[in-house]
Curated annotation (Swiss-Prot):
Transmembrane segment boundaries: 88-108, 118-138, 142-162, 169-189, 203-223, 236-256, 259-279, 312-332, 357-377, 388-408, 412-432, 443-463, 478-498
Primary role: Transports adenine, guanine, hypoxanthine, xanthine, cytosine and uracil. Transport is probably proton-dependent.
Subcellular localization: Cell membrane
Keywords of this entry: Cell membrane, Membrane, Transmembrane, Transmembrane helix, Transport
InterPro entries xrefs: Azg-like (IPR045018), NCS2 (IPR006043)
Membrane topology according to the record: Multi-pass membrane protein
Protein name: Nucleobase transporter PlAzg2
GO MF annotation: an example: purine nucleobase transmembrane transporter activity
GO cellular component terms, A-Z: plasma membrane
Similarity remark: Belongs to the nucleobase:cation symporter-2 (NCS2) (TC 2.A.40) family. Azg-like subfamily.
Regulation: Inhibited by the proton gradient disruptor carbonyl cyanide m-chlorophenylhydrazone (CCCP), but not by the sodium gradient disruptor ouabain.
Top-rank taxon: Bacteria
Pfam families the UniProt entry points to: Xan_ur_permease (PF00860)
Length: 498
């Protein structure tokens, strides 16, 4: 009778009732009353263990043993159904938190001369393949996409500032990825991170954030170049200005209220406002030619160093590598701690560096481990399956390409401004009590946006930091590797005068 009842409960998936009756049978059998039934129950229980997540012999240790399995390198093969659902949910949450990058990154790449359609395809491929590599090699729930800030460095510093073509800039991306991969195979990645003072690392983040704000205001038509005052605010009678500011307000409100997919919703809302108030140029209103892959053929694998100055290329690769290391190492470490997977640090760093190499081939700015992965980790992501789920959704976004190409600048610009604002809290970690540390940090923060060059802003901050510490007799506090980096930046400025 017990066996037939259990089979009925099993078939009806009444797990709680099944477990209760199963334990009764097991206890009686274990005490010697029904040895034959015990054997039947034991066989049934062993076959059912994957479904209800209990162990006949170690039920009281289920939670702790399962946690150990979830953090082991091969845990993906031992996931129970509830784990699979949680990983899928986490990957979906991460995707909707980061999907805005498809629109924003392609818009920034377009300013470098890369066709927007091709930029969309490159962004999707780099994100999808990056997430797959992270899931399969890194086995961690992190998300890899082209980084905000470093994409601005690609377009506005390397291409527009240093005079590289986008083909040469892509070559610099691939070479910086190779450097990052070589560094990730050794202990140099940690030495490089610790050699740079924390105040300067935080200042770089703040400076890039301010540069994003400046780019966003200009892209949204709120400000424009002016000979008399350098920057001039545009008329608020312009519908484009009003749409940009309204979308910025919408973005902030959605974020403050913690609405899921807030940035994506803000882009959709901003696009609707732009078309409603006819703030969209005719070119954007008609799209850029559908979802044809023909334009991508002119981008994929087109990286080239032909015609590039060796010194300019070296500085570009060196600066990119520094920023890539800074953006990734600290964030990877924090997110792995959050997910309880700190033992995966080396593999995750290697996976990230591999995707940077592929970024140059696909035709986009460097990929990074993005902060949006925290949303997926909070939703329960613990293994690489969450990343694989995110990558799969990125591939499926190809379906939406005809719609993505219709998104106007007025819907993208507020996202740049908002993300720049999110980078401001880093200023709290900068100490201005010791001016030999505070002033170089200030120089980086001010000069990156005002000189419109991430490389030059970092260079001035690094050189002044070394100089000030020597001047006040605290040169021993600075690591030798930092002096070497500072000298390389000095050479950068010297070569510019020749």
């Amino acid at each position: 009778m017990y066996v037939s009842s259990l089979l009925f409960l099993y078939a009806s998936e009444s797990y709680e009732s099944f477990i209760f009756h199963f334990q009764m049978c097991y206890n009686k059998a274990h005490n010697g009353f029904m040895p034959s039934i015990f054997q039947q129950l034991k066989g049934l229980g062993e076959g059912l263990q994957w479904k209800v997540g209990i162990s006949l012999d170690h039920q009281e240790k289920q939670t702790s043993s399962h946690e150990k399995e979830m953090t082991s390198p091969n845990s993906a093969t031992r996931l129970i159904p509830s784990d699979w659902r949680r990983e899928l949910l986490a990957g979906t949450v991460s995707f909707f938190a980061a999907v805005y990058i498809i629109i924003v990154n392609s818009s920034i790449l377009a300013d470098a001369g890369i066709p927007q359609e091709a930029g969309i395809i490159a962004t999707i491929l780099a994100s999808a393949i990056g997430c797959f590599i992270m899931g399969l090699w890194g086995n961690a729930p992190l998300v890899i996409v082209p980084g905000m800030g470093i994409n601005a460095m690609f377009t506005y510093t390397l291409v527009q500032g240093m005079g590289l073509t986008w083909q040469q800039a892509l070559a610099a991306v691939m070479m910086s990825g190779i450097c990052f991969f070589a560094i990730s195979m050794t202990s140099l990645v940690e030495k490089l991170r610790t050699a740079i003072p924390a105040s300067l690392q935080e200042a770089i983040s703040v400076g890039i954030g301010l540069m994003l704000v400046l780019i966003g205001l200009h892209k949204g038509g709120v400000i424009a170049s002016d000979r008399s005052s350098v920057i001039a605010v545009q008329s608020f009678a312009d519908p484009g200005v009003l749409v940009t500011l309204a979308t910025l307000a919408l973005t902030c409100i959605l974020y403050i209220r913690k609405v899921p997919g807030n940035l994506l919703l803000a882009i959709i809302g901003g696009s609707a406002l732009a078309y409603l108030f006819k703030a969209v140029p005719s070119k954007a209103a008609t799209g850029v030619g559908g979802s044809s892959w023909s334009s991508y053929g002119d981008l994929f694998g087109q990286l080239s160093v032909k015609g590039a100055s060796i010194t300019t290329l070296v500085i570009a690769v060196f600066s990119l590598t520094l920023v890539i290391v800074f953006e990734n190492v600290g964030l990877i470490n924090a997110q792995l701690k959050m997910s309880g997977r700190t033992e995966r640090f080396k593999r995750v760093t290697q996976a990230t560096s591999l995707t940077v190499i592929l970024s140059g081939i696909f035709g986009t700015s460097p990929t990074v481990s993005t902060v949006e992965a925290a949303a997926g980790i909070s939703a329960g992501g613990r293994t690489g399956w969450a990343s694989i789920a995110t990558g799969t959704l990125f591939l499926l976004s190809f379906i939406a390409m005809p719609v993505i190409t219709l998104v106007p600048d007025q819907a993208v610009a507020p996202i740049l401004i908002f993300i720049g604002g999110l980078m401001m809290p880093a200023v709290r970690h900068i100490s201005f009590e010791r001016m030999e540390e505070g002033l170089p940090a200030f120089f980086i923060i001010a000069f990156i946006p005002l000189m419109h060059s991430i490389v030059d802003g970092i260079a001035i901050g690094f050189i002044s930091y070394a100089l000030f510490h020597i001047a006040v007799g605290k040169w021993r506090e600075v690591k030798p590797l930092f002096y070497i980096i500072s000298l390389l930046f000095v050479m950068h400025f010297v070569l510019q005068t020749m």
